[in-house]
C-alpha cells in the first residue's frame, strides 16, 4: 500500500451524490499520495483528525465548480440544498452526537445508572437544544443512539467530522481567495502525513 498508490472503490450510478462521493474519496487519495511521497513509512499514515479535511475540501471545490458552470435555477437550488444538508449532517449533527457521547460516558464515570430511558432522554434534550425539535412528536428518533456504530466501536470519533469540516472550510476559503501562501500551506499539511501531533499538522494548513 505504501508507495503503491491508493485505490478508490465506488459504485457510480451517475447521481449527484456519486459525484460528490468521488470528489470526497479523491481527496483522501490525494492526501495519501502526497503523504506517502513526502514521509517515511513510519510517519506517512495520518489520523482521522486530519483525514476528513482533504475530502471535504474536495467536495467544496466540486460544489463551487458546478455552481460556476450552471445557470439553471433548479439545478443551483439542488446544489445549494445538498451543501446545506451536508453542513447540517457533518457539523451540527456530529457535534450533537459528540455532546451526547460525552454525557453518556459521564454517567458511567459518575457511577450513575445507564438505561435505555436515560440514554434516550439525553438525546431528546440535545435535539431540543440544538434544533428546537421536540422528539416527543417524533417517536423512535430518540433511539437514534442505538444504531450509530461509532458509539460502540469507535468512542469519541464523531467530533472529528465537525472539526475537520470547520478546518476544511476555513482553509478552502483562504485558498479560494488567494491568501498568500494558503495553497502551499494546505499542500504542506497533506504532505505532513502523521509526522506531528494532529492539531499541529492542521495549524500548518492555516
Q: For each of these PLM feature ranges, what is it?
A:
Residues 1-9, 80-96:
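Active-site-proximal, well-structured secondary-structure segments within enzyme catalytic domains
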Residues 35, 45-74, 83-85, 89, ...:
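Post-HExxH zinc-binding segment in Zn-dependent metallohydrolases
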Residues 19-30, 49-50, 54, 61, ...:
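Internal glycine-rich alpha/beta core junctions
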Residues 22, 30, 68, 94-101, ...:
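C-terminal, non-catalytic "cap/extension" segments appended to globular domains
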Residues 27-41:
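Catalytic Zn2+-binding segment of zinc metalloproteases
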Residues 39-46, 74, 110-113, 180-183:
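Short, surface-exposed loop/turn segments at secondary-structure junctions
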Residues 13, 17, 42-49, 87, ...:
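Short, solvent-exposed segments of well-ordered alpha helices
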Residues 3-23:
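Short pre-active-site segment immediately N-terminal to the catalytic Zn-binding motif
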